[in-house]
Curated annotation (Swiss-Prot):
Protein name: Small ribosomal subunit protein uS2
Organism lineage: Bacteria, Bacillati, Bacillota, Bacilli, Lactobacillales
Compositionally biased spans, kind Acidic residues: 228-239
Alphabetized UniProt keyword annotations: Ribonucleoprotein, Ribosomal protein
InterPro entries: Ribosomal_uS2 (IPR001865), Ribosomal_uS2_bac/mit/plastid (IPR005706), Ribosomal_uS2_CS (IPR018130), Ribosomal_uS2_flav_dom_sf (IPR023591)
Length: 261
């Protein structure tokens, strides 16, 4: 039984890749066809690979592992934050600060500064300081919150990264590779899949596609934490799996043509 249905993927536009001139040849095995200059991703393979990713993340979570959700592009920011929080995990949804993983000790010092500033605001220290100084401290706090708020309570470097658009998150990917941290990622037709450990061939530009896949990874964490016997996070329609009818749906959608990206 698959954790996601072909219908859900189609409705979210997961199958729409990039323009054919912007492709990475290494993604050829995951491409179904080409339509009006756009590559169409093979959703039959995506369904299976989502299952692989789901089980991988679920196993990490079941062993009390830390999952870091990463997506700094505009289309991913909201989903990354909301789904990571729902799963009780951590996230980076604005600019990735170099050294976030490879220089974790320094990052922890900046996080401590953020916590200190928050405490100063809460205990009334700000009320006793000159307005100009408070304005500067607030500016510093807001900046730290923007970039580090999602990992403020992360106990240690993550056990796995879930990434939306590895091309954009190159620094995060390279840091994870240096530390042998596995990467699960949404990989579009313009991306090199070799830099990702567990790939999910997918449109990584459409908000609905990003939300759908990210929510499934959050579901995997929730299920892993609840235990193997608890399947409360799974949707009823998931049981339909991949069928010939589902493939016909994909072919029909391609024929009707829609050049969303």
């Amino acid at each position: 039984m698959s954790v996601i249905s072909m219908k859900q993927l189609l409705e979210a536009g997961v199958h729409f890749g990039h323009q054919t001139r912007r492709w990475n040849p290494k993604m050829k095995p995951f491409i179904f066809t080409e339509r009006n200059g756009i590559y169409i991703i093979d959703l039959q393979k995506t369904v299976k690979l989502i299952d692989n990713a789901y089980n991988f993340v679920k196993d990490v979570a079941a062993n009390d592992g830390v999952v870091l959700f990463v997506g700094t592009k505009k289309q991913a920011q909201t989903a990354i934050e909301e789904e990571a929080k729902r799963a009780g995990q951590f996230y980076v949804n604005h600019r990735w600060l170099g050294g976030t993983l490879t220089n974790w000790n320094t990052i922890q010092k900046r996080i401590k500064r953020l916590k200190d500033l928050k405490k100063m605001e809460e205990d009334g220290t700000f009320d006793r300081l000159p307005k100009k100084e408070v304005a500067l401290l607030n500016k510093q706090k807001d900046k730290l919150e923007k970039f580090l708020g999602g990992i403020e309570d992360m106990p240690h470097i993550p056990d796995v990264l879930f990434v939306v658009d590895p091309r954009k998150e190159q620094i995060a990917i390279k840091e994870a590779q240096k530390l042998n941290i596995p990467v699960v990622a949404m990989v579009d037709t313009n991306t090199d899949p070799d830099q990702v450990d567990v790939i999910i061939p997918s449109n990584d530009d459409a908000i609905r596609a990003v939300r759908l896949i990210t929510s499934k990874m959050a579901d995997a964490v929730v299920e892993g934490r609840q235990g193997e016997d608890d399947e409360a996070v799974q949707q009823e329609e998931v049981a339909e799996g991949v069928s010939k009818d589902s493939l016909e749906d994909l072919k029909k959608t391609v024929e009707e043509g829609s050049n969303e990206e």
